[in-house]
C-alpha cells in the first residue's frame, strides 16, 4: 500500500501516536503535509460556495454526508483546500469527526485533542483561525442534525 494511502486511512489515534513520536515541529509539519497529499481531491462540482468554509485564509471546502438514524445520524465528511498544510489540517479534522454520530460530534472539542498533540501552538494565527472555522462548522452542523 502506498505511504500516502496508509496515512489517509490512519485513525485519529494513529495520527496522535505519530505526533507524539515526532517530537520536532518540522517533522510534524512534514507529516501534516503528507496527510494532506494523501487526502483525495474533492470533485470540482463539490467546490461550491455552500461547501466553502468561511473564516479560512486559504480556500477550504467541506461536504457533509449522513446515514442511519435521522434523529442522530452518522456523519462523514469530504474536504479539500488549495494549500498543502491546510489540506493536512483538513485530513486531521476529517479523521477526528468522520464516522461518528451527530450527538458525539457536537460534543467533541477537537481543540482539546489538537492542543494535547501540540498542533495548535505551532500554527500561525491565520491557520489556527481556519482550523477553528472548520471545527465550528462541523460541530454546528452536527448540533442541527442531532436536534432534528
Curated annotation (Swiss-Prot):
Domain of life assignment: Bacteria
Segment forming the signal sequence: none
Pfam families on file: SufE
Xref: InterPro entries: Fe-S_metab-assoc_dom
Protein family according to the UniProt entry: Belongs to the SufE family.
Stored PANTHER family: SUFE-LIKE PROTEIN 2, CHLOROPLASTIC, SULFUR ACCEPTOR PROTEIN CSDE
Protein name: Uncharacterized SufE-like protein RHE_CH01250
Species this protein is from: Rhizobium etli (strain ATCC 51251 / DSM 11541 / JCM 21823 / NBRC 15573 / CFN 42)
Amino acid at each position: 500500500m502506498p505511504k500516502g494511502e496508509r496515512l489517509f486511512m490512519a485513525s485519529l489515534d494513529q495520527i496522535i501516536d505519530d505526533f507524539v513520536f515526532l517530537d520536532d515541529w518540522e517533522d510534524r509539519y512534514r507529516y501534516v503535509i503528507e496527510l494532506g497529499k494523501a487526502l483525495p481531491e474533492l470533485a470540482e462540482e463539490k467546490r461550491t460556495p455552500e461547501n466553502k468554509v468561511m473564516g479560512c485564509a486559504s480556500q477550504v471546502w467541506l461536504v457533509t454526508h449522513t446515514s442511519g438514524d435521522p434523529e442522530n445520524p452518522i456523519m462523514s465528511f469530504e474536504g479539500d483546500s488549495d494549500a498543502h498544510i491546510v489540506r493536512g489540517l483538513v485530513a486531521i479534522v476529517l479523521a477526528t469527526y468522520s464516522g461518528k454520530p451527530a450527538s458525539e460530534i457536537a460534543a467533541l472539542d477537537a481543540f482539546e485533542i489538537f492542543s494535547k498533540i501540540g498542533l495548535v501552538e505551532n500554527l500561525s494565527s491565520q491557520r489556527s483561525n481556519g482550523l477553528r472555522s472548520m471545527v465550528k462548522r462541523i460541530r454546528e452542523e452536527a448540533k442541527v442534525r442531532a436536534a432534528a
